Amino acid sequence: MKTIGLLGGMSWESTIPYYRLINEGIKQRLGGLHSAQVLLHSVDFHEIEECQRRGEWDKTGDILAEAALGLQRAGAEGIVLCTNTMHKVADAIESRCTLPFLHIADATGRAITGAGMTRVALLGTRYTMEQDFYRGRLTEQFSINCLIPEADERAKINQIIFEELCLGQFTEASRAYYAQVIARLAEQGAQGVIFGYTEIGLLVPEERSVLPVFDTAAIHAEDAVAFMLS
């Protein structure tokens, strides 16, 4: 079994499912008392979020690249960045850390393609929904077209993420709002929906979505397990 290095803490609420899902995957594959060989570097999300708001993405790239190098020195054999949004600086991490980097959009793209879909809704932070680092990769590498909510909906989705989900708050009102947005995107022709912020899966259970769900945290964790046992 390979040792996986997790870059977490963005927020820590979403890092917990990664650790659980990876260990469950290893136990399911190997049985008995087997558990995952995991190293974790959890950053201070306050610093990362402030850099996001100020547009200081180069600084966040430096922080995460240094964290990845620390995991490499500690014995990690691959890197998993436990957040969708911060894959905006994936290139900065990959350019300085020589370990295999398991990109969340690649794992998600393979899952969508495997389901026979080419047109999906994308929910996440405004950075993930509006910028090209995530949607563009899905289009270029997997020919997947992403539909995103209207501007006012994107603002509300982003607000719920940072003011509720990142703080571990999951309300019925927000759950219903997300379900409403998903239903509207389904009417526009979306075949499935990407939960492109890892805490969304904690808010909206699959049965509340009219579309098949691609929970990126679960997909990414499954990809990590496959890598660890390869």
Q: What feature does the model see in each segment?
A:
Residues M1-S230:
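Non-catalytic structural scaffold of enzyme domains
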